[in-house]
Amino acid sequence: MNKNGKTGLNSSLLLLSCLFFTGFTQAQYGTQSGEWLSYGGDTGSTKYSPLDQINPDNFVELEIAWRWTSVDASLPLDALREDNPDIQIGNFQATPLMARGTLYIITALNQLAAINPLTGETLWTHNPESYLSGPPINPLSYHNRGLAYWSDGEKERVLAGTHDGYLISLDAKTGIPDPDFNGGRVDLNIGIPRATRNNLD
């Protein structure tokens, strides 16, 4: 076999190997056991669940099991708007996480909550009061796309970025700020010279 033939064969084998491992990796994606551990479902952001209890045949039979009222509704919004007229709670864009039998959610005003998925009962809430710091430091105003969940098999943490530039970490079971995470939050503005609160420039 000439040199060109060997090169072509090697290239073909390399391509087949890449396709094989890519297919194998993709097969590992997808949520497991109904859990939704990331914004897109899994680390591959497949947004896919293999659960099949709900299908086109029984979709019309679905009924509302419970409703959940956002904890933002319990805030004195009129009083808050006197200091910050831009506050709003209508931009709800978060995707709830489902981890180890609990739903986790973040509201438009950065309040976090854990919810029993069977009953809709609120298990705990955490209010970092980021809305008291003034307008969000991001240009997208008051909304949040979601949370992150982390576990080492024993400890469980829920993490979220806030409008005023902090990253908070809470115990997923209790909602208590993580003492090993700088008391529960770190300042993301540190080390970024042009990033200052109340200034979008």
Name each model feature, range by range.
Residues 25-27:
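Boundary at the C-terminal end of the N-terminal hydrophobic targeting segment
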Residues 11-23:
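Bacterial N-terminal signal peptides
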Residues 29-69, 73-74:
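Blade/loop signatures of beta-propeller domains
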Residues 2-13:
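Bacterial N-terminal signal peptides that target proteins for export
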Residues 68-95, 125-152, 180-201:
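Extracytoplasmic beta-rich repeat domains
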Residues 36-40, 88-111, 138-166, 199-201:
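Repeat-blade elements of multi-bladed beta-propeller folds
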